[in-house]
From Swiss-Prot:
Assigned protein family: Belongs to the DNA gyrase inhibitor family.
The UniProt record lists the keyword DNA repair: no
Oligomer status and interactors: Interacts with DNA gyrase.
GO cellular component: cytoplasm
Cell compartment(s), UniProt: Cytoplasm
Source organism, top-level taxon: Bacteria
Gene3D superfamilies the record matches: Regulatory factor, effector binding domain (3.20.80.10)
This protein's UniProt keywords: Cytoplasm, Stress response
Protein name: DNA gyrase inhibitor
An example molecular function term from Gene Ontology annotations: DNA topoisomerase type II (double strand cut, ATP-hydrolyzing) inhibitor activity
Primary role: Inhibits the supercoiling activity of DNA gyrase. Acts by inhibiting DNA gyrase at an early step, prior to (or at the step of) binding of DNA by the gyrase. It protects cells against toxins that target DNA gyrase, by inhibiting activity of these toxins and reducing the formation of lethal double-strand breaks in the cell.
């Protein structure tokens, strides 16, 4: 899988932190996030899922993720936003690629991307969260186009 190494700025994010099998928690988190965004007239810059764990090493019931939107740096959390966290995704060097996800199979492009990175002779994965940015509304289109970001360090 082809990818680029990019220098990314930090992103301020607002949304929900969930623990459990990603195939359940990510959908649940985005359902909550959509309601919060609509109810508070939030204007998201991006829709993002942040992944904190390696599913090959961490049991499914302990997998952590955030379902979030990027917001301006000076974002103030509105009243009645229980459960919503405002934090940031660190800036730095990331390997970045784009993939189309069909049939809710987000795992395959991630495994392909990670396997390509493991073969890289110049960069290695950093022990920081990975994330994906949604480029379209898959619930409407029937597929998702996503940008995948993996933090990297020179070898």
């Amino acid at each position: 899988m082809d990818y680029e190494i990019k220098q990314e700025k930090k992103r301020t994010i607002a949304g929900f932190h969930l623990v459990g099998p990603w195939e359940k928690t990510v959908k649940q988190g985005f359902d909550q996030l959509m309601m919060w965004v609509e109810n508070h007239n939030i204007e998201p810059l991006e829709w993002v899922a942040v992944y904190y764990d390696n599913p090959d090493e961490v049991p499914a019931e302990k997998l952590r993720c955030d379902t979030v939107v990027t917001v301006p740096e000076n974002f103030c959390l509105p009243e009645n936003s229980e459960g919503v966290n405002v934090t940031e995704i660190a800036g730095g060097q990331y390997a970045v690629t784009v993939a189309r996800v069909q049939g809710h199979d987000f795992g395959t492009p991630w495994y392909q991307f990670i396997n390509s990175l493991l073969e890289d002779s110049q960069y290695q994965m950093a022990h920081k969260p990975c994330f994906e940015v949604y480029l379209n509304n898959g619930a409407v289109d029937g597929y998702w186009d996503i940008e995948m970001y993996v933090p990297v360090l020179p070898k």
